[in-house]
Amino acid sequence: MRRLTLILAIFASFTAAFAQKHITDSLMINGQMRTYTMFLPEGIQKDAPLVVFMHGYSKKKVKNFDRFGLDPVAAREKFAVCYIHGLPDSTNHYGYYVGYPPQASMQKHETSDICKITEAVQERYQLSKVNTFATGMSNGGDLCYLMAYEGQTTFRALAPVAGITLNWIFQKYEAPHPISIYEIHGTADKTSSWYGDMENKGGWGAYLPLKISIGYWVARNRCTNIEPTDTIPSKDPASTHYIVQHRFTGGTDGTEVWVDEVVGAPHTWHAKDMNTAEAIWAFFRRHLK
């Protein structure tokens, strides 16, 4: 009997580990093979929430998503994570089309493609078509803004990290509907400057200062409340960084705009200064329906 119990325990352990293993799959979208990696936690239910993640602009294919810390949160909260892999541009950097100069040769319907991938994932894994959210780092964060301006309806809320609004997007589009946005950004970011780069000194294309970028969404969402700012220290006792939390609430249909201003921090996911994945899920959880 003890032997049978041991065998069953080992089997259960194996099953749990397998259930939480990353699953990589592909599908054809607009003539291009798009690859994604799923994390489906053990015990996930039908119609569970889905968080879609887009990585940063990279010299090589991004394979290690563990450093973003979303999986442990998903395992506890029982939501799925879909990591969508970027495509190469003319310089063989992997990412998502947002209009960087090296991306001129890429197909220019990234919002539509990301939404189609997400909808296929919802169907394939029986996930919620309502409680679906998107987050991204750097290039992936920039894509969050492009998707918001283009009026996607697949995602209920967006959480760009180190994201920027390129000026061509700002000039071309008028966002057709409000959407909740949570930006996390370092003030010492030299890649995606907090202060913008309207002269295109960085080579990404001209982009807005973050205060203007965020101000657009505060106005578009018709937020009526500015909550008192809260300042919290970095979780790293040795760090001189600190986080100023800005909250604009009371928007149309409950929309809001959050900004975590990580003072002194560079271009990063900010996991050394705060529990970024936890913070993003806390924001998304507010918008579950």
Please place each PLM-identified region on the residue numbering:
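Short beta-strand/loop motif that positions the catalytic acidic residue
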Residues: 183-185
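Alpha/beta-hydrolase active-site loop
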Residues: 103-124
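Short substrate-entry loop that stabilizes the transition state in hydrolases
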Residues: 44-92, 155, 167-168, 191-193, ...
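Cap/lid segment of the alpha/beta-hydrolase catalytic domain
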Residues: 85-109
